Regions:
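N-terminal secretory signal peptides
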Residues: 1-36
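A generic structural signal for short beta-strands and their flanking turns/coil linkers
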Residues: 117-119, 126, 152-156, 175-181, ...
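Catalytic-pocket segment enriched in acidic/His residues
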Residues: 69-91, 107, 134-137, 188-302
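Hydrophobic, well-structured mid-protein blocks that either form specific transmembrane helices
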Residues: 166-202
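Extended, compositionally biased flexible segments
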Residues: 68-174
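Structural motif
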Residues: 96-98, 120-122, 155-157, 178-180, ...
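Short, structured patches in soluble enzyme cores that scaffold and shape functional sites
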Residues: 125, 154-156, 160-162, 180-185, ...
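N-terminal twin-arginine translocation
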Residues: 34-42, 50-70
Length: 302
């Protein structure tokens, strides 16, 4: 435990600038009533006033300077975001959710972009956007507020066990812990409105339960996904139908490019982009995501 340099008046920040203010310090034999910090500075000099324990012995507030912020008590608890791991009692702790935009050429074109010219771009969702979908079950997914054009986007999700900066593409897949199937749900009208106004469009992408996801399968169980049929059905009708080998940027390239902008870490997950034919759903619709090698993802809009 350590005493603070002085007893500050309520609302005053402690710094080399504010220590010059005129608030009185607690009286003591060395600091009679009415003594201010400026008086102490005149007597001892600035360095002495800042560093002398003798001149300010009467200050009584104490702080624990050795305690790590991570070990201190908090006023409330925040639940961690996790996703179950197939074949394990452990769960995967989600640190960040990265998403790549327009990563299939046909989808890029349907969104008004030229995939032959544009580099990859990424955005994020909050970790609590995760909505877990157990295999073999259908999960109710609430239709979100503020939208009249709610879209599905089926995607392969890569989960990282390690990370770093400027990861070489040749090393990128060694950082992958496993894979899952997910939906990047989108309030398309809000996204487009923000885009038209040149504003960030998180309101269209980064909202509650906007990231339904199945359980994570470890690489040892599935291998890496460089190809495979990926589909999204609505009420049994195929809406999206493509192959993972049609990605503009594969998973290894995505990891490498992302690490140029962010320090990737264990717990990060990457939604790897959606094929063409995204479209709207309404309450009562059943979405079924399919990917060869992973269980179906069944989500009902309510």
């Amino acid at each position: 435990m350590s005493r603070e340099p002085c007893a500050l008046a309520k609302g005053t920040r402690r710094s080399n600038a504010t220590i010059l203010q005129q608030e009185e310090i607690t009286s003591s034999p060395s600091n009679p009533p009415g003594t201010t910090r400026r008086d102490v500075l005149k007597t001892l000099g600035t360095a002495g006033a800042l560093g002398s324990a003798t001149a300010l012995t009467a200050c009584s507030t104490t702080v624990n300077v050795s305690a790590s912020p991570t070990t201190r008590a908090t006023p409330f608890q925040i639940a961690a975001t996790t996703s179950p791991i197939v074949g394990s009692n452990e769960v995967f702790p989600v640190r960040r959710i990265y998403c790549i935009g327009r990563n299939y050429a046909a989808h890029a074109r349907e969104m008004g972009s030229d995939p032959t010219r544009e580099p990859p771009f990424f955005f994020q969702k909050p970790t609590d956007a995760i909505q877990f979908v157990p295999p073999g079950q259908t999960v109710d997914h609430p239709y979100p507020p503020l939208t009249k054009n709610y879209h599905y986007e089926i995607e392969l999700v890569a989960a990282l066990k390690s990370g770093g900066r400027n990861i070489a593409m040749a090393d990128a897949l060694s950082h992958v812990y496993g894979y899952a199937l997910g939906l990047d749900m989108t309030r398309r009208d809000l996204q487009r409105a923000m885009g038209d106004e040149k504003k960030p469009w998180e309101i269209g992408k980064s909202f509650d339960r906007s990231a339904p996801i199945g359980p994570i399968h470890r690489v040892g169980q599935t291998g890496h996904f460089s190809k495979g049929r990926i589909q999204l059905l609505v009420n049994g009708n195929v809406k999206q139908n493509a192959d993972l080998n049609q990605m503009i940027w594969n998973v290894a390239e995505q990891i490498s490019k992302l690490s140029e902008a962010f320090e990737l870490m264990a717990g990060d997950i990457i939604y790897s982009g959606t094929p063409e034919n995204v479209g709207p759903v309404v309450r009562g619709d059943l979405m079924t995501g399919k990917l060869e090698g992973l269980p179906d993802l069944n989500v009902k809009v309510v």
